[in-house]
From Swiss-Prot:
HAMAP family named in the record: Cyc_amidohydrol (MF_01989)
NCBIfam families with a match to the protein in the record: amido_AtzD_TrzD (TIGR02714)
Classification via Pfam families: Amido_AtzD_TrzD
UniProt-listed Enzyme Commission number(s): 3.5.2.-
Keyword Hydrolase belongs to the record: yes
RU A: annotated span: 1-90
Gene3D superfamilies associated with the record: Cyanuric acid hydrolase/Barbituras, RU C, Cyanuric acid hydrolase/Barbiturase, RU A, Cyanuric acid hydrolase/Barbiturase, RU B
Name of the featured protein: Cyclic amide hydrolase
Chain intervals for the UniProt region annotation (RU B): 99-231
Subunit structure: Homotetramer.
Protein species of origin: Rhodococcus sp
Annotated segments matching region RU C: 237-349
Amino acid sequence: MTSPEDTAGVEAALAAEGFSPTDVRAVMCMTESDGFGRGYASLAFAHAFAPALGCPPEDVAQQIPMIMIGGCSGLVTPYAAVFVDDPASSWVTDGSGGGLSIGVTTTATLNPLDVGTPAMVDAVADAVRSAMAAAGIDKVADVHNVQIKTPWPSSAALLDGPLSGLDAGSVGAMARAAGALGVAVALGEVSRADITADVFLRDPNLRSDVASVSAGTERVDAAVLVMGNSPTSASPYRIGHGVLRDGIDPHGVLDALRAVGIDSGWPFTADTTPVEHVFLKSAVDGTDECRGRRHVLRTDYLGPYSWLLGKAVVHATVASIVGDPMMQVSGGGEHQGPPGGGTVAVIAR
């Protein structure tokens, strides 16, 4: 993508492969917006897809989840990734396969006062279960990445609610926390009985190792995209995941590679990499040290941008192994992987 509003590459790629927007299941982007919920890539894609879908642009997101991540720090490549249905595919499965499968859904419209609360956890958990069913995934162990875009209500919408008085950044953090805990509950990573209002942003032991949650002002519901492997899928792709213990941990991505059958050959180059896509969630700025050494991500003059700097760190670590800087890198890792680290998922053929 040459800019956040650049949809030409996606439109050309769809046309070249004989697809149209009606075949699109989900869109993900890395854009050079500010990352604070004010990006406009989703609006550009909505206008591009609306004519083919036969609906006004404002309704496109109800048909096609759009998960746009702003902030291309370091060497992160701005790009768009599109998931499509291919009814003409010649791929076959013998039922034993475990090919890549995705399921998409949305929650009902969320009351702004429920955002960042246990009520939102329940709504997201139900949506994750529905998306798993849509993907043909029966076992939670076969789920390797759950992308969620939650609402990011304005301060005015939160008056007299449980988040009243919080600044905009804190509201976004609570929304992401609720989304992540919803995934954790749905997949059995956390017991629902442990979810109370006072654990949000306070108990890092309550977390999901496959969730990747972002928040946006454009949503009034939570969009959910579950990615995993299903024995009913004929896809030649597989997905696996790992956990990054800190920002310079190579073992998380190596675990993800092994999970898709790649046991050797790293570090790869752009010409040799077997990796099709990587999804990273950074929680690098969740602590003030790395392996016992103090760092100043949160305390020097760039402290307000610690989330952005953390993304650059973890991106460099993973890109140096997979051999490609084009990958999704999302900050705001509340309850997503261990503080100071993050999560990674890899799709390979």
